[in-house]
Structure formats: C-alpha cells, structure tokens
Amino acid sequence: MFCYMKIKDIVNRDLVNLTNCESEPIHIPGSIQPNGFLLGLDAGTYTITYCSQNTTDFIRLSPEVMLGKSLADIFDQEQYDHFVSYADVADIDPARPFVFILDDIPYNTTVHTSGATLVLEFEPFPDGAIGLPDLYAQTRNFVSLMEKHSHLLDLCKDIAGEMRKITGYDRVMIYKFDADYNGEVIAESKRDDLNSFAGQKYPHTDIPAQARQLYVRNQLRVIADVDYIPVPLLTRGDENTDNRSLDLSLSVLRSVSPIHLQYLRNMGVCATLTISLLQKNTLWGLITCHHYTPKILPHYTRLSALLQGHFLTSQIAVREVAEEFEVGQDVEKALSNSLSLLHQNENFIEDMWDEPSLLKIANATGFVIYYKGKIYQSGNVPEQEDLLPLLKTLSEKYPSEGLHTDRLLDVYENGEKVAKYAAGIVYHSITAGTSDGILWLRKERRETINWAGNPHKAVLVNEAGETRLSPRKSFELWMEEVKNKSVAWRKVELHAAASFAYALQKHINLRYVRNQEQRSRILNEELKAANKEL
C-alpha cells in the first residue's frame, strides 16, 4: 500500500522579507547555498530528519526518498560503518572532514552538531580530485614572515599577500575593529587594476551585533556567488515530527542574509571568504577576501586560509604586547627617575615640578600639579583662568577614582578653550577633601578619517520614526575630520601615572606628618622654656 509522506520546508520567511538587518535571525535561515547539499540526522538514531531540496542536483536520491530513512538505508554498509566510527567522538574536528563516495564521485563532508541534530554538508571536490595543500610549505612561509617582522602592521601586510596566493581571490583585506566595532583596513593585497581600500574605515552598522556573534562562533564563512538562489531545507511535516528550525550557526553552506548579499552587490563583489581574528573570545578583526566573479573555494584551501588566520591570531597579542613593551620601557624609566627624585626631595612639588620626566611618565604634552591653591605647571597647558575651573570640576566629580579620557569635551562641557591644549587628560586627586590634584594633558590631534561611504547614512529612519539598518548603496570615499581628540592613552602610561599619583599622595601625607611632628617639637620646647621661666 502506498503511503504518502507530507514534506515541508523550514525557510525563515521573516528573514526573506526583512528590511532591518539589525533584527535578522541569520543563524536560522532554513536554506543553504547551492554549491553542496545538506542532510540533518537524529544524533541518536542517524535517521534523516532534514534534507536540502537540491540533492538530485548531485545524487540520484530525492528528499522524498531520504527523509525518515536511516543513513544506513542510503549508503553502503562499509561507508556507513566508517562514518559511525568517525562521528562517534565527543567533539568532531571540522578540519578533518569525512569523504563519502557517491555514484563514484568523492564528496567532502563537513560534520557538526546542532542541538540534537548531526549536520552533514556535502561538497563535490573540484574536478573530482582530492587536492591536499602543502601545509608544511605554508607553515614554513608563515614562520619566515613571523621572524621577518617585529611590528604587527608589517606582518599583516605580508599575511594578506600570502592569503591571496593561497586562495586566488582578487582582493584580500585585514580589518581591525575599534572599541565601537568600526572596522579599518590595516592591510591589503589586490589585483593591480583595483582601487585600494587600505586605510578606509567601515561603520559598525555594516556588521550588526548578531553577525559579530556568529563570527565568534564560526570563524570561517564563504559565499560562492552573491546571486545564488537559496535552497530550502525540507523536513517531514506530519504531526509526530518536531519541526523546529535548524540552527546553522556552524554551517559552511548556510544561506546568507539577503541584506548582506545586497551590500556585496552594491560593492560589485561576487564571492567572498571571511575569517575571524579573535582575542580572548572577542572579535579583534577579520580577514576578508573579495572576488569579482563567482568562485567556489575547496575545503582544503579554506582550511589553509583558516590556518593562516590562526597563525595571525596567535601573533596579535604577542606583537601588541611587544609594541606596548617598547613604549613601556621609556615610561618605566621616566617613572623610576621621578620616584627617585620624589623620595630624595622633601619639597619635591615646589622644587621639581618642571622635571622633564614628569611629562614622560604618560608621554604627555602638558603637566600640572595643583597644591594648596597654587598651580605648578610645565609643557603646553591652558591659561590658569581656564585651568582652575577644570581642576575644581574634576576634584568634585572624581574625588577618589581618577579619570582618563582622550576627549575632554565628553566629560567637561565648557572646555572649548582648555581642549586646545588638553584634548585628552589623566587626572588623580592627591589630597582628600580638597581640590589638590595632578593632571597630565595631551594636545589635540586632528585626524581625517576616510570612510567607505557616509557612515551616518547606514542608519535610516522610516515614516513611523523607527530606526532601521539597510545595505549601503554608496561606498564613495567620505572624509570626516575629527577634532578635540587626543591620541589614546596606553595602559602602561595610565598605570605609570596612577603609580606616581599614589606615591605623591604618600609623599604629601608623610610631609604633613613630619610637619606636625616638627610643630609638636617646637611647641614642646617652647613650653619647656616657659616652664623654666616660671
């Protein structure tokens, strides 16, 4: 007797119709890219519960035939047994895919778990050949680059070139994110006929928060053709089937946000590869590859590219610490010299306030000590009539915790005159309950930021007054001049400034105690003299 099985797709219609990329549920599209096919298995029974609609583009079995069957019913016993052995581990290594042979064609099969589902993604090898990269040569090249460069930016430039050699993309860029997730292209390798994007910034709205979270979870994403037609995922639609959406966060073939695809089309890009650069499980930056025609990248080439990303990730913290250490050596030397003078001189504030090492403690352009109603200053500082209100405000707002900022006007509204000399400050109180304080100042550094398009036009407001993010249409260079901002303070500079401020507090307290003791001795001697006279 013929039994009709009801089948339904799990395409996320909200995703397809969405106009606001900030709200996109991009991890559950319910569809994949068409350069492979997908099976979802019950992890306990290996029953096929999900199947992409395009299986007959690759093999002779349709979704109607496979859904509800065991994997053992579909593949020969030897391959099934090998796969069970491969998948029966606590953590499946995605870098070590399984190779299925179907109709005499080898398929690279990446496997991962998604809840209670085992997700298998099948991709035919290019030209039917399993081409393995020369990972030894690539590793050797990276080690050579690592030894060649001491600074991170120089290393990134060569890594971009190496990545382009490995993958064959038209353009490779390395982005670094700032604290607000605006991305800057810090290194680039490209075809000679292409315009350079090096030094350009892209607003944080280009990569919404949920996309950044996916980049942390899945460190590689590939798009073979931005004009692809999404392939729906199918599942059984009878009453006894749990038809929840399938989380494809870790998928290679996962269908991409239609808004992101339009964004790429607006750039003229046809295919991409993106690799995450993480530091302490936070997105530090991206390696982004662009191609201007469709491009399918084989798994093992993707693996090589990902390996380069891991290499670079391993060096980011090392190089940043090394560069910080270079600055730190000079700062520590200045701090040591200042502390030595402080301990040797009872009247340090009055006698040594213009010592050059005090500026060098924080690489400042101006330095101020305000003590007992008097200002001691060196370097470039504001007029005293402008400085006194600032010191009063700081002592009231930050009596104990201190303050550092590279944009004074954000914390001091009436500081236009001061900002000319002190766009950035580090402040510490030195005497409790008074306006006494110590201040390092940094002058303004005007900067022109080259945005790839107007960053403010990435956010649109509709007729209902709702804020929406949409794919930008223009990437024409848009220059923004940044004023009233200093170079950011480094951690080592802030630590040195705090250490000296603490030492100065102790010095003042100790001097107060000594003065009190001296006054007591004088008073006692005067009393003794008076008693003798009596």
Describe each model-derived feature in a short phrase.
Residues 291-297:
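A generic structural motif
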Residues 311-314, 318, 364, 396, ...:
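Short, well-ordered loop/turn and helix-capping segments at boundaries between secondary-structure elements
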Residues 170:
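Classical protein tyrosine phosphatase
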Residues 1-145, 150-166, 175, 179-270, ...:
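Non-catalytic regulatory/interaction regions at protein termini and inter-domain linkers
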Residues 484, 491, 495, 499, ...:
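Amphipathic alpha-helical coiled-coil "transmission" helices that mediate dimerization
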Residues 82, 131, 300, 316-333, ...:
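Short alpha-helical interdomain "coupling" segment at the junction between an upstream regulatory sensor module
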Residues 138, 297-317, 489-503, 522:
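Amphipathic alpha-helical "output/dimerization" segments
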